[in-house]
A protein has these predicted regions:
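Short glycine/proline-centered loop/turn elements that form peptide/ligand docking sites
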Residues: 134-140, 151-158
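Residues at the starts of beta-strands that form the adenosine-phosphate
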Residues: 70-71, 127, 148
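A short, structured active-site edge motif that brings together acidic residues
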Residues: 75-80, 87, 93-112
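Alpha-helical substrate-recognition element adjacent to the catalytic core
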Residues: 2-89
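Short, aromatic/basic amphipathic alpha-helical patches
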Residues: 85-95, 116-120, 140-146
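Conserved Lys-Pro-Asp/Glu-containing loop-to-beta segment of HAD-superfamily phosphomonoesterases
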Residues: 109-136, 141
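Short hydrophobic/aromatic-enriched beta-strand-loop microsegments
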Residues: 99-101, 147-156
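Structural beta-sheet core signal
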Residues: 73-76, 130, 151
Length: 158
C-alpha cells in the first residue's frame, strides 16, 4: 500500500470522495465516456437515470469496507435534478449513509464543505483528504486549504 493510501486508511483521517469520475466512472455512453452533449445533460438525467446503471470501482469499495463508513464521505457538485441519482448510487454501491453524501452547487462550496468537515470531526484540515479526478480542483483545494489532496489514480494499484 502506498504512503498516501496508508494515510487515508488511518482511523483519524476523514476521506472525502468526489462522485463523477471517482466513485462513478465516466461510462455514460455506449463505448464512450459521454452519452450526450452538455446542453442535453438535464434531459438525459431526468429520462435515463444514468447513475442507476454505473458500475462502482472495486478498489474503492474494498478501501471503504476496510476503513468503515464513519469517516468516509462523498462530496460532489450537483444540480437539483442530479441529487437523488448521485446520492442513491453512493448509498447503494458504497454503503455510505445518505447523510455522508454532501452535494454542493459549486467548487467553492466544495472547499467550504471540506473546511466544515474538519470542524465537524474535530480534526485539522490536513486530516481531511479529498480524492478527486480533476487536477484543477485538487490544485484549488491545496491552494485554499490545508487539506490533503489525492488523485484517484492512487487507487489504481490498491
Amino acid at each position: 500500500m502506498s504512503d498516501i493510501l496508508s494515510y487515508l486508511a488511518e482511523p483519524e483521517t476523514v476521506v472525502v470522495f468526489d462522485i463523477d469520475g471517482v466513485l462513478a466512472p465516466y461510462e455514460f455512453g455506449e463505448l464512450s465516456h459521454a452519452a450526450c452533449l452538455d446542453g442535453d445533460w438535464k434531459t438525459y438525467v431526468l429520462e435515463e437515470h444514468p447513475y442507476a446503471h454505473i458500475r462502482p470501482v472495486p478498489q474503492i469499495q474494498r478501501f471503504i469496507e476496510k476503513k468503515g463508513c464513519t469517516r468516509v464521505l462523498a462530496c460532489s457538485v450537483a444540480e437539483d435534478f442530479e441529487e437523488e441519482g448521485k446520492r442513491d448510487f453512493v448509498v447503494a454501491n458504497y454503503g455510505l449513509p445518505a447523510d455522508h453524501v454532501k452535494l454542493v452547487r459549486s467548487k467553492n462550496d466544495k472547499v467550504a464543505e471540506l473546511r466544515a468537515l474538519a470542524k465537524e470531526f474535530s480534526v485539522s484540515e490536513r486530516r481531511v483528504a479529498l480524492v478527486e479526478d480533476t487536477v484543477k480542483t485538487l490544485d484549488e483545494v491545496a491552494r485554499k486549504t490545508g487539506c490533503t489532496t489525492v488523485h484517484v489514480s492512487s487507487f489504481f494499484f490498491a
